[in-house]
C-alpha cells in the first residue's frame, strides 16, 4: 500500500490520478486477493491454489500487454481467444483488480479527512444502530416524514460519467465502460432474479462501489439543495471529494422553486426550519418540522432531480408523505413512529389541589411481527400463520449442530432487535424458533415433541434460548440489579454493521 500511495503522490503534482498503469501490476491482484476485498473465483475452485491463481493473473497481464483486447468488438469473440476462453474467469480477475484500484484515491481522501477532523475510532461510527439514538433525540419534535425509495436502474454511461468527476484518468474510464458493457448486467445486480446471472454475485465489490458512487452523486446534490433552502447550513456532512462545474450544473434545479412567483413574494416559504436526512441502502428518510408544503416542495425537488440529472423516469408514487403522529415508517427492520404519551400530574397550591393532563411525544420503535413471520415461513421455520414446523433439511445434522444453528439465529435476532419498545414480539419469535428446534430434533429421533422433551434433559433447550437478561446476568453479576432496568428499556449496540436477515425480509439460513 505504501508503494501505491507513493505512486499517487507523484501523480498528484500534476493534479491527476492516473490509475490505469496499476492495472498491469501483479501485486495489485495479490492485494485484492489477500485483503479480502472480494472472493476470488479461483479460491472457490478446489482445482486451483494461490500460486496457480497468481500464475494465471500473470498470464492475463502478459496478454493485456501484448494485445489491446479491450478494443475488440464483442461479436469477434470467436476470433479472439481472450474473449472466447475463460470469459468469466478473466472478468472476475479484472473486476477484482479494478475495484481495488479505484478505491485507492477514495480511501486516501477518507483517511486524510478523518485525520483533519481528528476522528480516531471511525469503526464505532459504522454501526447502523447508532442512528436510532439520533432518531430518539430529534424525530420526536418533527411533524412530517418523506419516505423515499431511491430509483434504479441507472444507465451504465451515467455511472461512468459520475466517476469522471473524481477520476480524471480517461484510460481507466474507457476500460470500465467496456467492461460494464461487455460483461456486466447492472440491472440484475440491483434487482436479483432467480434465473439471473451469477456474474454480479462474483463481482459484488465492483458493483457495490459503482452503486455507492451513484448514491453519493445523488446525496451530494441533495445536500447542496438543502443548503440553498435552509436557515442553517448543514454541519453534519463533510465534503470529501472535489467537484467540477457542480454549482453551475445545479443552478437550474434550484431555480425550479426559488423563481416561482408565490415563493418570491414570501421568502419564509423557501427556508426550511428544521430537517433531517437518513439513508440505508435504497431506503432514505427525510423528516421535517415544517408544514406539508415543505414536504411537497422536496418531493418535486427529488422528482426533478432524478429526471433531469440522472435521466430516469422517477415515479412520484415512490415518495410517500406521512405525518409522524398518525403513521409509522419502516427503517432498518423497525417500525418507527412518534406517539403521544399521556401523563397526569397532581399539583397543589396552598389548600387547592388539581390535576394536569400532560402529553409528551415519544419516539417508538416496534418489531414488525407480520413481515418477520413471513420471513420465518419462507425459511421453513413455521407456516404462514406462525405455527412452528420442523426443519427437514437440518434433520441429518447432529443434535448439537441443530441446537447451535437455532441458538445463533435466536441470539442474533435478539441482539439486533434489542431496541424494541415492547418485548412481546421478541418472545413470539423466540417461541417459534424454540418449538421449531424441538420439532426438528423430534423428527430426527422419530418421536413426538412431548416424548422427546421428557426423554432429554430439561435444560437442553433452555441453555441456548437464554434471554438477553440472562446474558447480562452472566456478564455483569454484581451490577445485575441496575442492568435489569436497562434490559427492560431499549438497548442499542455499536457492533452491528449490517441489517439482520430476518429484519431485511430476505432470510438466508
UniProtKB/Swiss-Prot annotation:
Biological process per Gene Ontology, one example term: RNA splicing
A single MF term (Gene Ontology): RNA binding
Disulfide links within the chain: none
InterPro entries from the UniProt entry: Domain_X, Maturase_MatK, Maturase_MatK_N
GO cellular component terms attached to this protein's record: chloroplast
Compartments in which it is found: Plastid, Chloroplast
Claim: Transmembrane is one of the keywords in the record: no
Pfam families: Intron_maturas2, MatK_N
Protein keywords: Chloroplast, mRNA processing, Plastid, RNA-binding, tRNA processing
Keyword RNA-binding: yes
Annotated function: Usually encoded in the trnK tRNA gene intron. Probably assists in splicing its own and other chloroplast group II introns.
HAMAP family found in the cross-reference section: MatK (MF_01390)
Family classification: Belongs to the intron maturase 2 family. MatK subfamily.
Protein name: Maturase K
